[in-house]
Amino acid sequence: MNSKVIKPFVRMLISDTGGGHRACAEALEAALGDRVTTDIIDLMVNSGTPGIEKMPAIYAWLEEHPKIWGVLWYLLDGPARCKALSDPAWLAARRRYKELITEGNPDLVIVLLSLIHI
């Protein structure tokens, strides 16, 4: 009898925005080894939403311009200001995020991006 073992499929959601998300996902992938099938998806880049798709590149640019980053941090710091930005972004990207979560019917989805706990 020739039975093929189907491995569980684990999807990890990250963004390359400097928080170590990819490093965490890669460490999990290494620890899980060949017991599971994994993929790592950058939610921002794959959001299908202009502006959000560019966030990793914007973040990288801001790392090179700390004074501008500081001004933006000061201007955007606070729950109300954060909500004013995140709510429209969520509305714009939520359909695509739901697709990214369910595509391929993963057995487990691990969100390693604290900004996007959906």
Predicted regions and their residues:
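N-terminal subdomain of nucleotide-sugar transferases
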Residues: M1-N46
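A short, structure-level motif marking secondary-structure boundaries and short turns
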Residues: M12-I14, R81-K83, T102-G104
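Structural motif
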Residues: I14-S15, L112-S114
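Charged, low-complexity surface patches
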Residues: H21, W90, L108
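Conserved N-terminal ligand/cofactor-binding loop architecture of enzyme catalytic domains
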Residues: A27-L100
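Short N-terminal targeting/anchoring amphipathic segment
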Residues: R94-L113
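Conserved small/polar residues in nucleotide/adenosyl-binding loops
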Residues: I116-I118
